[in-house]
Amino acid sequence: MAKYTPNELADTLKEGLLSFPVTSFDANLQFDEENYRKHLAWQASFPVAGLFAAGGTGEGFSLTPAESERVVRTAVDEVGSRVPVLASAGGSTAQAIENAKAAEAAGADGILLLPPYLTEADQAGLVEHVSAVCRATSLGVIIYNRANAIYKDTTVATLADRHANLIGFKDGVGDLEHDARVYAKLGDRLFYLGGLPTAETFALPLLQLGMSTYSSAMYNFVPQFALDFYQDVRNQDRAAVNKKLNDFVIPYLDIRDRVKGYSVSIVKGGLDAIGRSAGPVRTPLQNLAPQDLADLKALIATVS
């Protein structure tokens, strides 16, 4: 059973840093539950506001439904008493409903609703898609604005009016006008989180558009740095943010951008670099090349 009402969950998540733990695999690319539990326990030992199990950084796209449910259950069991645990729901409307129900049964506290799978939809279709999921669960639901699910401000307002358990808007597009429209129309009815890759890059300007938090991938391997960066953002300390961008985040981006798909691979590479390996990534992703891993390890040493 969820430990938070939707409103309580929103109030908790919007005031702190969020992260998507990687999913641990063994050498045969099978879920390594023991190692995953160790990683979660370490992550939860820092003051993170919420963890999203089996999300994008957790290679949720490479997990079977049964694996995803097991990952979520493991996360709830290991750290659910200390930090909110959220799960993803995606695919077709029917699949997203199944995901949401399974997450609720597993004890998750909330749902991140991913875009429908490989199909285009108009705003009316998106309203029905989100509505079906919100009706299927009592958990707080966060919609993810990206790719083929771009929610107009009027659409978000319609959904917020219909469903009290719609609590959040995550943006993975970066259209500033769009974000401004949504925040201006909805205000405090929702909470807003940044979801662009390596969200630290955009965190300070997006704070002005109501995005008080974001999902940090690098929290997986440099949690204290990630928390310090987040605090600098919330303090609107531009000098401190820019220093951290120049010293670490931008060089990190340079390594990430060497190969398509490194956005996830580099996070597991970061764990390799600090001696807390979560195993390899599953295909179609590729593990970091040796030189890229060496460069990342040297970079991490500058902030550890």
From Swiss-Prot:
GO molecular function: 4-hydroxy-tetrahydrodipicolinate synthase activity; 5-dehydro-4-deoxyglucarate dehydratase activity
Main EC class the enzyme belongs to: lyase
Gene3D superfamilies named among the record's database cross-references: Aldolase class I
Superkingdom of origin: Bacteria
UniProt record, GO biological process: D-glucarate catabolic process
Pathway assignment: Carbohydrate acid metabolism; D-glucarate degradation; 2,5-dioxopentanoate from D-glucarate: step 2/2
Signal peptide: none
Pfam families, sorted: DHDPS (PF00701)
Classification via HAMAP family: KDGDH
Similarity field: Belongs to the DapA family.
Entry protein name: Probable 5-dehydro-4-deoxyglucarate dehydratase
